[in-house]
From Swiss-Prot:
Enzyme Commission number(s): 2.1.1.173, 2.1.1.264
InterPro entries, per the entry: 23SrRNA_methyltr_KL (IPR017244), DNA_methylase_N6_adenine_CS (IPR002052), RlmKL-like_Mtase (IPR000241), RlmKL-like_Mtase_CS (IPR053943), RlmL_1st (IPR054170), SAM-dep_methyl-trfase (IPR019614), SAM-dependent_MTases_sf (IPR029063), THUMP_dom (IPR004114)
Catalyzed chemical reaction(s): guanosine(2445) in 23S rRNA + S-adenosyl-L-methionine = N(2)-methylguanosine(2445) in 23S rRNA + S-adenosyl-L-homocysteine + H(+); guanosine(2069) in 23S rRNA + S-adenosyl-L-methionine = N(2)-methylguanosine(2069) in 23S rRNA + S-adenosyl-L-homocysteine + H(+)
Keyword Transferase annotated: yes
The organism's place on the tree of life at top rank: Bacteria
Function in brief: Specifically methylates the guanine in position 2445 (m2G2445) and the guanine in position 2069 (m7G2069) of 23S rRNA.
Segments passing through the bilayer: none
SMART domains: THUMP
Intrachain disulfide bonds: none
PANTHER family assigned: RIBOSOMAL RNA LARGE SUBUNIT METHYLTRANSFERASE K/L, RIBOSOMAL RNA LARGE SUBUNIT METHYLTRANSFERASE K_L
Enzyme class of the recorded protein, top EC level: transferase
Protein name per Swiss-Prot or TrEMBL: Ribosomal RNA large subunit methyltransferase K/L
Record keyword rRNA processing present: yes
Organism: Salmonella typhimurium (strain LT2 / SGSC1412 / ATCC 700720)
Gene name for this UniProt entry: rlmL
């Protein structure tokens, strides 16, 4: 009997133990990352040929204590390597682990290599050569604290390399893990199996090989025992012949079918090639189509299983597409696959929540460094009066109602950008804005008292419903989480895409950026104020302070202003403002752009203007500004400075976003100014629910 070890992915140990016992292994003991077991030479070959779950089959050679590099050298040399190596066999050493003595794995591997080579030269035997790429023998050494474990890797390359996959194409899951996913899916061989996101076909190929009794090692061309002195070629050929016979019989007798699809034609062609190399190509139908085109290939039965490893993302901007994908899959399963089973393997349990399905079973496993979960679902059978599956129905209905009303209004007004939904329903606390054929969902970060998992799932539902109601592709939906912050956080960069979208607002054309910043470059609630400025600007010198991207300057210029002066502290936004002006044919000396601290510039300027627009921050304490600013505290002082620049008969339009702002009318009167509130006149139908989004005033000399 040989003492052996089979390694596997974390989470698959018990499944591997069961498999090895079925092959005839005895004394199986599960440990983290694998199974210790015992077996004769035939079982070694059987486990190499037939294990669908083992990553490697290891034959332990010995252990030694390592307190110095000499201890490692002598411990390795104590093994009788001349009884392990065939004459002329090449080898490679894989060394892992460090301690106070062996601080570099390459150094450890070198000491092991020297010990093995010297074991031959001391007996006046030809020294074996090292071949790091394709050795006849692989020696593994693991150093854990002071103990080194030395073993022979009988697999050679990892057992997940079955020999059928095109190794130029990366696979998101190894074949051994794919086999485990199939085994845990609840699928019964002999029933249909479908993968709607099959990629290179690994799940379907592993399932077909299992169902047709085709050994996973049958197509491998190289093994780790080819240079092993104790290798028994006769027994190996018997094991191999048996596997070939069973494969032919299994394929001839199998009657069910497999279905795979993917949106990438190149990947599908690779899947077909892989299936042909695996010997089961005739059993699998591969098609180029995406999940939106998914339909039941057997609507009249029999029932089968849908299995997949759907994509997931780690970046926020990838979530809308992934949420839409999962939501669509869930609805399609409920509407077309009643009576079927569904099994999905994912690194994102949150995304699986978008299916709107309740799992019957779930399993955990590692996919490389990723913690993953596999969830199995049974899809209830549909009846003639079953309603199509929906998601976030209350929200979807409100969005649909708003769209019907506001879309017509926006078209009549000649605007492409408007707020479609503004936390109309408390449980769906988001804002949804339209920018042409794009949509932006802004979610305020929920308070800590709200369960984060529930809040995230609610957001996923909102995204799925928004895509459905608006009928836009996922790549035209942008998701943002907006903290309730002060100062100039809206100027902080979120991304580096640099993608700009041209939109129309009345007679103006403007650039917006939906992804790179918290705000898009266009404050939608100030739309009417900008139009009013355009109507007031003819023949006037216009000043735009805290100008942001200069959209008010564009409207003033198009309204016939004699000149526009646009002032902002940000070089980025001034360059953006210049692009906006040029887009509308406004350039030259009549349209100045000034980068400056607006408050400092205001105190030093000695020019005169007929119309001034100022939309300062509620509060600012920027390092680049010379002082802090509070709009409630400082607005009278601000008006004092503005009055100095205002020509006789001129007008200041003053707006801010401070809730509960109180205009100091007495303070203005002392300056000889009067204020007329025009807030209600500047609120458009899309902001009718949020009357406090800004306040706006016209200020003139008394």
């Amino acid at each position: 009997m040989n003492s052996l070890f089979a390694s596997t992915a974390r989470g698959l140990e018990e499944l591997l133990k069961t498999e090895l016992e079925k092959l005839g292994a005895v004394g199986c003991q599960v440990v983290q990352g694998g199974v210790h077991f015992q077996g004769d030479t035939r079982l070694i070959y059987q486990s190499l040929m037939w294990s669908r779950l083992a990553s490697r089959i290891i034959l332990p050679m010995g252990e030694c204590k390592v307190y110095s590099d000499l201890d490692l050298y002598l411990g390795v040399q104590a093994i009788n390597w001349t009884e392990i190596f065939n004459p002329g066999a090449t080898f490679a050493v894989h060394f892992s682990g460090l301690n106070d003595t062996i601080r570099n794995s390459q150094y450890g591997a070198m000491k092991v290599k020297d010990a093995i080579v010297d074991a031959f030269t001391r007996k006046n035997l030809p020294r074996p050569n090292v071949d790091r790429e394709s050795p006849d023998l692989r020696i593994n050494v693991w150093l854990n604290k002071e103990t080194a474990s030395i073993a022979l890797d009988l697999s050679g390359d990892g057992l997940h390399l079955r020999g059928y996959r095109d190794r130029t194409g990366l696979a998101p899951i190894k074949e051994t893990l794919a086999a485990a996913i199939v085994m845990r899916s609840g699928w019964q061989p002999g029933t249909p199996l479908l993968d709607p996101m099959c990629g290179s076909g690994t799940l379907l190929i592993e399932a077909a090989m299992w169902a047709t009794d085709r050994a996973p090692g049958l197509h491998r061309g190289h093994w780790g025992f080819s240079g092993w002195a104790q290798h028994d070629e006769t027994i190996w050929q018997e094991v191999k012949a048996e596997a070939q016979t069973r494969a032919r019989k299994g394929l001839a007798e199998y009657s069910s079918h497999f279905y795979g699809s993917d949106s990438d034609a190149r990947v599908i062609e690779r899947a077909r090639s892989n299936a042909r190399r695996a010997g089961i190509g005739e059993l699998i139908t591969f098609e180029v189509k995406d999940v939106a085109q998914l339909s039941n290939p057997l609507p009249k039965g029999p029932y089968g299983t849908v299995i997949s490893n759907p994509p997931y993302g780690e970046r926020l901007d990838s979530e809308p597409a992934l949420i839409a994908l999962h939501s669509l899959l869930g609805r399609t399963m409920k509407n077309q696959f009643g009576g079927w089973n569904l099994s999905l393997f994912s690194a994102s349990p949150d995304l699986l929540g978008s299916l709107q399905l309740r799992a019957d079973k779930q399993f955990k496993a590692k996919n490389g460094p990723l913690d993953c979960v596999q969830k199995n679902y049974h899809i209830a059978e549909t009846t003639a009066d079953s309603k199509p599956a929906t998601v976030a129905e209350d929200y979807a209905n409100r969005l649909r109602k708003n769209l019907k009303k506001l879309e017509k209004w926006a078209r009549q007004e000649g605007i492409e950008c408007y707020r479609l939904y503004d936390a109309d329903l408390p449980e769906y606390n988001v804002a949804v804005d339209r920018y042409g054929d794009w949509a932006v969902i802004q979610e305020y970060a929920p308070p800590k008292t709200v369960d984060a998992q529930k809040a995230r799932q609610r957001l996923f539902d909102i995204i799925a419903a928004t895509l459905s109601v608006l009928g836009i592709p996922p790549n035209k939906l942008v998701l943002k989480t907006r903290e309730r912050q002060k100062g100039k956080n809206q100027y902080q960069k979120m991304s580096e895409k640099g993608e700009f979208l041209e939109v129309s607002e009345y007679n103006a054309r403007l650039w917006v950026n939906l992804t790179d910043y918290l705000d898009t470059g266009l404050f939608l609630d100030h739309r009417i104020a900008r139009r009013m400025l355009g109507e007031m600007s003819k023949g006037k010198d216009f000043l735009n302070l805290f100008s942001y991207t200069g959209s008010a300057s564009v409207h003033a210029g198009l309204g016939g202003a004699r000149s526009t002066t646009t002032v902002d502290m940000s070089r980025t936004y001034l360059e953006w403002a210049e692009r906006n002006l040029r887009l509308n044919g406004l350039s030259g000396r009549a349209h100045r752009l000034i980068q400056a601290d607006c408050l400092g510039w205001l105190r030093e300027a000695n020019e005169q203007f007929d119309l001034i627009f100022i939309d300062p921050p509620t509060f600012s304490n920027s390092k680049r500004m010379e002082e802090s600013f509070d709009v409630q505290r400082d607005h009278v002082a601000l008006m004092k400075d503005l009055k100095r620049l205002l020509r006789k008969g001129g007008t200041i339009m003053f707006s801010n976003n401070k809730r509960g702002f109180r205009m100091d009318l007495e303070g203005l009167a002392e300056l000889g100014l009067t204020a007329q509130e025009i807030t209600q006149k500047t609120l458009s139908p899309d902001f009718a629910r949020n009357r406090q989004i800004h306040n706006c005033w016209l200020i003139r000399a008394a």
